[in-house]
Amino acid sequence: MSYNPLPQPASIGFGTFGSTGIVTVTDINPLPTYLQNIEVTGKGRLKVSTPETIFFNTFQYGIETDVWDTRVSVGATAYWDYTISGIGMSVTSSAGSEVIRQTKNVMRYIPGRPAELAFAVRLEPPKSGVRRRFGLFDGQDGFYFEDDGGDYACVIINSDGASGIITERYTRSEWNGDKLDGNGPSGIVASPSAQQMIVMEYEWYGAGQIKFHFEINGKVHNIHTINTGNRLPYPWCKTPFLPIRLELKNTTGVSTGPHYLYQGSNSLVSEGFTDKSGIAQNVGTAVTGKILPVAQTYYPLLSIRLKPTALTGVVLPTFFQAASLYQASPSQNATVISLAYKLIRNANLTGGTWVDMPDENAFTQYNRTTTGIGTAGIDLDSGFIIGGNSGTGVRLDKDTQYQIGRSGIGTISDTLTLAVAVLDTGVTGAVAYGSMTWIEQR
């Protein structure tokens, strides 16, 4: 018996409703197969990878001011409603009454990895003059689902156009999927008074797809897909590093208020593991160190923040180090002493100058000349560095969120400060040293 390793054509017979046919199958002409209910990425790959959750929140116990920034005007409010484990957003009957909710962090994105942003939301029946929006956007770039008071729409916006912000808005009559008006393949009519799961799948590269889905009773109903490839002369939005955002506004002064938008859980899931890869940056104190005048008092060693020109940058602190020496008199040798440390978000820093990192590509500024930390701020990490272990580095938990965010709806960077204190009450004038390392995703 001989064996021929080269592929050979084969003929396959099949019948359909009494008829028969012969198909010759080769490597060049394979047998066609079709898979039902299988999703693929924008590159045509089957979605078989393990997804990674980049962001989620649940509002079990409050409005989560450490994660979400809120701006209200003309009597609008945002409040925690324990009966729905969510946030009620409310505007008054006055024109211009508005509430905006936006994550302090922009969302991480890795090119080549489609991502899905999910909202649990409850709208209300559309009311002329009342506008609701939610999606991944910052007012200048991104995408969102909109109820403008008269119609629903899927929208992308781009600030990189020569004539200002470019808007592509597709109303319900223009959707290329199931319009969920009772006349689509599902026969479903989406209720604005019911809690809904609305998902937006996107891929950037400047020319990716943006898909809008409703998830109802375990089934995905695609309502519209925006195709940007081979069509636009510019990226569909300037950056994929954008915040999750919801808006509610009384645009015309509808007098029958208040009007509501109810925000539930959110999640952002990426296909495959993105890992926290990026460009490393590091800053340290001067080699002469920094004097700690009084024992058991915290002093700032180093602080970092986003550049005012890079507020959508993704900065992930990873590692810091501290050490201290004390010399009781010029005739004595310096000794290593024990320290307490704290890593503080938005300390009330006194004095100092913010300086751009030497790398012109960096997203960050540093400050090593501040003199006090005040009493404000949130301690993200704390601990002790004992004598002989002085200089030991502290690696931050990779699964904990330390990303530097923004407030003022994206206009003011958070700060991250490494502060230390001498533990020994008999030590004054010790000299401390420190360094911080972080990753910038570009």
Report residues per predicted region.
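Aromatic sugar-binding interfaces of carbohydrate-active proteins
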Residues: F143-F145, A190-A194, V199-T285
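Flexible, glycine/threonine- and acidic-rich loop/arm segments that mediate assembly and lattice contacts
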Residues: Y34-L117, V121-E124, Y205
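Residues within well-ordered beta-strands of beta-sheet-rich folds
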Residues: E116-R122, R131, Y144-E146, M197-E203, ...
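Secretory/extracellular carbohydrate-interaction modules
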Residues: S90-I166, R305-P308, L325-Y326, S331, ...
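Glycine-aromatic-enriched beta-strand/loop faces of beta-sandwich-type recognition domains
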Residues: R131-Q195, T375-G387, G391-R395
